[in-house]
């Protein structure tokens, strides 16, 4: 997720993964504020056994697209409500990926 303010929503995904017995990593890295850290973390994900990323982000929601650009396996983008537009900005950001950067979008 891109910010600790996203933890309230994204922790629900963690609960579901735990109930299903699926191991996971939960990390907070901003695509806008920490791009180098995001690149390093994402490029090493597959070697750590990660098979799918669930990337939650609000507002401009660059995180899911950046993850998809750097990670060869599936990325699920979760648009989160920001300060404006009730999360619709994040929905459109995640749904409008360029060709070759696939992101599945899951919204509540």
Which residues fall in each region the model found?
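Short, ordered loop/turn segments at secondary-structure junctions
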Residues: 4, 29-31, 58-59, 80-83, ...
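Short glycine/serine/threonine-rich phosphate/pyrophosphate-binding segments
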Residues: 6-11, 34-38, 57-66, 85-88
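Hydrophobic/aromatic ligand-binding patch that stacks against planar heteroaromatic rings
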Residues: 16, 66-69, 94
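N-terminal beta-loop-helix "entrance" segment that forms/cooperates
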Residues: 24-48
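Glycine-rich phosphate-binding loop
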Residues: 41-80
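Short, glycine-/small-residue-rich phosphate/pyrophosphate-handling segment
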Residues: 83-108
């Amino acid at each position: 997720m891109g910010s600790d303010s996203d933890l309230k929503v994204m922790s629900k995904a963690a609960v579901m993964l735990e109930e299903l017995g699926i191991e996971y990593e939960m990390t907070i890295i901003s695509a806008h504020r920490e791009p180098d850290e995001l690149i390093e973390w994402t490029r090493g994900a597959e070697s750590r056994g990660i098979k799918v990323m669930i990337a939650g982000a609000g507002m401009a929601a660059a995180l899911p697209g950046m993850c998809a650009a750097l990670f060869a396996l599936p990325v699920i983008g979760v648009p989160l409500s920001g300060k404006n537009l009730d999360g619709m900005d994040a929905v459109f950001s995640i749904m409008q990926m360029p060709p070759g950067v696939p992101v599945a979008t899951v919204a509540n």
